[in-house]
């Protein structure tokens, strides 16, 4: 599928972690960039920040030099100071792992002052964060980058939103595309997101085509390549 769609690589995490490496064995090391997830199963998404057993789990599965970042991890406002969260943030810093938080603008505003020396890739551009909120954090935190999966509001109905377009132009080196093919139970019990993957990619390319060529190339792949290249090994 990646070959057919021209997708070169992606950040991948699994619950449990072994799924990432099964996929990597099939697609190759260059295609699958492993992320260190704090989740053993779907329920950990909601409880990990207060579950002390997550710390030894993360430490036990960590593959030094192979996992490139810590995340995606869900973080609510008021949770950045919790002991489990602080312990794993410190672990990520010691191991030179970038952070990939799934957090709204308020939670990010609490997190970023605690991790000023760490590179942060903001998952889903804050999920519900407005362009103004994203801009405010980018202006303040130079080590913050932004990933755009699940943000249908970037191009409602396929037409690029003017506010997002202006923000991309102001920060041409900070944004990158994403798709997010999660499976969480309930409605999503199988391969629904993977089945929709070609449509997701085509939708992204539709709004990228509405940007200037160089800016579109940055968001499509160049920024992600630069992001990975500047990470410590």
Annotate each PLM feature:
Residues 42-50, 155-160, 186-196:
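Short, flexible/disordered intra-domain loops and linkers
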Residues 15, 75, 125-126, 224:
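Flexible loop residues that form catalytic
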Residues 17-100, 145, 150-154:
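Active-site gating/metal-coordination segments in enzymes
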Residues 36, 82-186:
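Catalytic pocket-lining loop regions of alpha/beta-barrel enzymes
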